[in-house]
Curated annotation (Swiss-Prot):
Highest classification ranks of the organism: Bacteria, Pseudomonadati, Pseudomonadota, Gammaproteobacteria, Alteromonadales
One Gene Ontology biological process: error-free translesion synthesis
Record-linked NCBIfam families: PRK05461.1
HAMAP family xrefs: ApaG (MF_00791)
Disulphide bond pairs: none
Protein name: Protein ApaG
Annotated ApaG domain residues: 2-126
InterPro entries in alphabetical order: ApaG_domain, ApaG_sf, Uncharacterised_ApaG
Transmembrane feature ranges: none
Coiled coil: none
UniProt organism field: Shewanella woodyi (strain ATCC 51908 / MS32)
Pfam families: DUF525
Length: 126
């Protein structure tokens, strides 16, 4: 990994949204809150996102596009940006991972890796 790639820390919290899910219809809604922390020495701007979402049936969905939740935030050194979004799975368990396409003030582009995280209804996994 490059110095730029290691300057970004990503924390994830997930939540199963039971009241908006319908297991009988194979619809499981999950919310995830992402915190992106800039540990580097210069501002970076989040330009793109890429998600790989796999449910427990090994069905793969890929989501990519500009920014996150309609924004392309600039994250100053020693600060964080947080947002919440969601996804629907056909199974009660899945895994998400991906990356953010970032750019420095000097125009240097790099990818900040989003480590794999679980989406699971409570009590399913021990």
């Amino acid at each position: 990994m490059t110095e730029l790639e290691t300057s970004i820390k990503i924390d994830v919290k997930t939540e199963y949204i039971e009241d908006q899910s319908s297991p009988n219809d194979e619809r499981y809604l999950f919310r995830y809150t992402i915190t992106i922390i800039n540990l580097g020495k210069e501002p970076v701007t989040l330009k793109t996102r890429y998600w790989s979402i796999t449910d427990s049936n090994q069905h793969l969905s890929v989501v990519q596009g500009a920014g996150v939740v309609g924004e392309t935030p600039t994250i100053e050194p020693d600060t964080a940006y947080q947002y919440t979004s969601g996804t629907v799975l056909e199974t009660p368990f899945g895994v998400m991972e991906g990356n953010y396409g970032m750019v420095t003030e000097n125009g240097e582009m790099f990818k900040a890796k989003i480590p794999p995280f679980r989406l699971s209804i409570p009590g399913l996994l021990h």
